[in-house]
Amino acid sequence: IPNLIEAGIVSFKIEGRLKDMVYVKNNVSFLRKKIDAYLEQNPNYTKASSGKCTFTFDSELNRTFNRGYTDYFVNERHQAIGSWESPKSKGQYIGKLIKTIGNSYEIENGELLNNGDGLCFINENNEADGIYVNKAENGIIYPNVLKEIKDGTFIYRNNDAAFIKIVEREDSAVRKISTTLVLTENENGFELTATDEDGY
């Protein structure tokens, strides 16, 4: 972000087409915090927008839809620049599948998972596959559908139920513009004048 600002970029576009509110809030807040942190250290730059944004959650790009990252050809040319496993979002890496136990799975760091989470993994056909967590208990995951997953398979969370619940709150992202109110008395009664922080 600092390099882009110093290169003269004045507007940052977020890829939000067909995305939901949680995705937009998460991505906007992530960039807003990065930009604000830079502006605090560099008084020669100022933001174009008015007001101050506050967020009640810690934004993390891999907790909402994310296809991963590439530096394209910035550092060197690569033979393959695409993600060929799937156009879907794998999500946040949780850990490896330790073993299948009856109708459940034991997963590394399984205690991080919650009821309603969506999990993604790459199956033996090298395709993205997934399950939902019906119940998470003491690191053991009971899925909505029991699928054959090889021990050692990397497990990702691409639907974070607890995070979504926090971000969906109406007060999770708020922008306020400071205003000065002046109440004066005139021959016709009283007049209230409001002036925002930019003098309008």
Give the ranges of each region predicted by the language model:
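Surface-exposed amphipathic alpha-helical tracts and adjacent flexible/coil segments at the periphery
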Residues: 1-200
